[in-house]
Amino acid sequence: MLPVVALVGRPNVGKSTLFNRLTNTRDALVADYPGLTRDRKYGQAKFEKRQFIVVDTGGITGDEEGIDAEMAQQSLLAIEEADVVLFLVDARAGLLPADQGIADHLRRINKQIFVVANKVDGIDGDSESAEFYSLGLGAIKQIAAAHGRGVSQLLQDALKPLESDFPDMEIIDEAPEEEEDAESQRQRLQELPIKLAIVGKPNVGKSTLTNRILGEERVVVYDMPGTTRDSVYIPMERDEREYILIDTAGVRKRKKISEAVEKFSIVKTLQAIEEANVVLLVIDAREGITDQDLSLLGFVLNSGRSLVVAVNKWDGLSTDIKDDIKREMDRRLGFIDFARIHFISALHGSGVGNLFESVQEAYMSATKRINTALLTQIMEMAQDDHQPPLVRGRRVKMKYAHAGGYNPPVIVIHGNQVDDLPSSYKRFLMNYFRKALEIMGTPIKIEFREGNNPFEGKKNNLTLAQQRKRRRMMSYYKEKK
């Protein structure tokens, strides 16, 4: 599980600027997945060899009404679920009543909090930040998010205390030649239960589907402190295969006796996706493909998880409406053509039984053993069918390929100038490998490594005989001139 860092503060203090810097994003597009939008408030961030989830909670002033009040409530929920809170204030504007109001709320929660004075570029940061000590939340960290000043030190201080509680936070670099590590990883995955996360936006029928799969009312309504943080982990067995169901809808808040409203948490959903081997994304057929569905798909793809899509509430729809929905899915979900899509009714059970065939297929594809000889052969076939382009007048040469990891499958290609391959050719290779290996239900990651020249940096030392020959040749050419 990855830790969660929440960015908190009133409007216009620079939360979005810091968010973009941490997640390396500037717009709503996800690289290499045309047509997919990214939620600007939630993202995956990497700092040095650590990764974490960052949440931009939006501006909170304390006097919100209507829909703004609902958004503020979601922000407060994100704060409750965070492991570290970065409380941003504007060093140029000074301490305002809204800052004091947010500080009053933060004092009541038991979280690690850092007060971050932003926009200190071009001013005396120490003197301008001094008044924020009156908030009573400890030392003040000074940054200029727009230019990156002070951000590295801030992250060092914020993430260091979390290392013992979140061992998954560390990114482990696998050496390309260590294929044994990839194979041992594959064997471990084969022996463990399949972790299946059921995710989707509120009220699409996640709990109904979970109960239908389990055959009993297991996902109950909780009303206890502490249950808002964790997803529900349910062990089960199907077709002689062990599973762990990660249910993100297991925690709900009862408003009325007859009405249970899901307490939706994107943070909890992101953590479930990171934890899972296969993600079952539930979409409401009656609402079509929404931006929130696309955001969740973006998180799944960025995490490299296997994917199965279940379009729920399919029963009762007319043939014309069903055809319209299928056309919309073809148009908007073309970038996940590797994933199986099922049309189901969780309430009545139709189509639910077929889901696990696709879940197993996706997991087997993600953990399939692929040897170096086969991968290199497929790479050479792809190279023969469609030659790599010229780069600076030279043809890119791919030499060999091997497995670099599993879940998702990682293919490492070595060669000359491979880093300069255009994205279109990389997509061609990805599709070629997928078709040749019959991989379904999981994304493929291809890494490119430049071939090292063994003579690079070495001086050519001539023997005495070679030196005499070289002198004779040089004198010969001089005489000819």
UniProtKB/Swiss-Prot annotation:
InterPro entries: AAA+_ATPase, G_ENGA, GTP-bd, GTPase_Der, KH_dom-like, KH_dom-like_a/b, P-loop_NTPase, Small_GTP-bd. SMART domains: AAA. Residues 368-452 form the KH-like domain. Keywords: GTP-binding, Nucleotide-binding, Repeat, Ribosome biogenesis. SUPFAM superfamilies: P-loop containing nucleoside triphosphate hydrolases (SSF52540). The keyword Nucleotide-binding applies. GO terms for biological process: ribosome biogenesis. Signal peptide: none annotated. GO terms for molecular function: ATP hydrolysis activity; GTP binding; ribosome binding. Residues 3-166, 194-367 form the EngA-type G domain. PROSITE patterns: G_ENGA (PS51712). GTP 1 binds at residues 9-16, 56-60, 118-121. The keyword Transmembrane helix does not apply. GTP 2 binds at residues 200-207, 247-251, 312-315. HAMAP family: GTPase_Der. GTPase that plays an essential role in the late steps of ribosome biogenesis. Belongs to the TRAFAC class TrmE-Era-EngA-EngB-Septin-like GTPase superfamily. EngA (Der) GTPase family. This is GTPase Der. It comes from Alteromonas mediterranea (strain DSM 17117 / CIP 110805 / LMG 28347 / Deep ecotype).
